[in-house]
Amino acid sequence: MLPQKKTDSFRLEPVPDQHIEVKDKPRRKWYIGETSVWVFLFLYLIAIAYPLLWMVMSAFKNSDDIFEHSWSLPSSWHPENFVSAWNQGISSYFMNSVIVTALTCVITVFISAWAAYGLSRFEFKGKGFFLVLCLGGLMLTPQVSLVPLYSIIQSLGLYNTYWALILPYAAYRIPFTIILIRSYFLSISKELEEAAYLDGCTSFGVFFRIFLPMSVPILVTSGILTAYHTWNEFMFAIIFIDDENLRTIPAGLMQFRDALQTDWGVLLAGLTISAAPIIILFLLMQKYFVRGIASGSVKG
């Protein structure tokens, strides 16, 4: 009979409680930090959203109701304020802003996309200088060039025309838009471009068939940023346009305010109409905006 080997018996020691406590501390800190962030974002949302909600609610009130019940819902709703605001001049300002904003966006995005394509895919002398020139354009404020720009517009016969606003707006937005779109184009694979050249595509074909369809998020983002700047710009709109029939929303609201100093409900209805398009545009294109900003910041 074979002798039996002695086997050592092992006993598992319980894990000390202090290790469990150490693991719980980071989780507790993370929970407190997340709660603080949500509280901050909620307060920030109230600070941003409440003035807009107050403006919309007050647009449905009459002047007496605005002063007597400033922080509450309208005691009686007056949707006719919007009709009065539209008929008393907002319609003209609104359509002028739509024309100027649409043409500015098309010109800015198209020229910037062409320039960004050349800067991201071709090598030529002066390429670095052109990029520096774009950066320099970002540093030039409109106030600095106001006097010479006014003289140029007068000499070209553009004063009191839509082009007196469209061309300066596009000129000031193109440098930033070029850099933004170029960063996105750099993230597009060169293999796709090479395959298109092998299939017989020209540079124009590659641009229109590959780059533009793949760059919808950044193009929409550029359009939104340009539209926001153009729609709300005030200085050029008040200086380069003197004709009441050509004024855009920011400049026209000054005349609208002077004409309705006592009718606050109609005035706030006009302000609501002027603010609505950009808010709606951003809400509809929000997913493209976020994707465009995130992808456009990958490479520089």
Curated annotation (Swiss-Prot):
Its main location: membrane. Keywords: Cell membrane, Membrane, Transmembrane, Transmembrane helix, Transport. It is found in: Cell membrane. The keyword Transmembrane helix applies. Residues 94-285 form the ABC transmembrane type-1 domain. The chain crosses the membrane at residues 37-57, 98-118, 129-149, 161-181, 204-224, 264-284. Pfam families: BPD_transp_1. GO terms for cellular component: plasma membrane. It is a multi-pass membrane protein. PROSITE patterns: ABC_TM1. It comes from the Bacteria. GO terms for biological process: transmembrane transport. Probably part of the binding-protein-dependent transport system YurMNO. Probably responsible for the translocation of the substrate across the membrane. Belongs to the binding-protein-dependent transport system permease family. MalFG subfamily. This is Probable ABC transporter permease protein YurM. The gene is yurM.
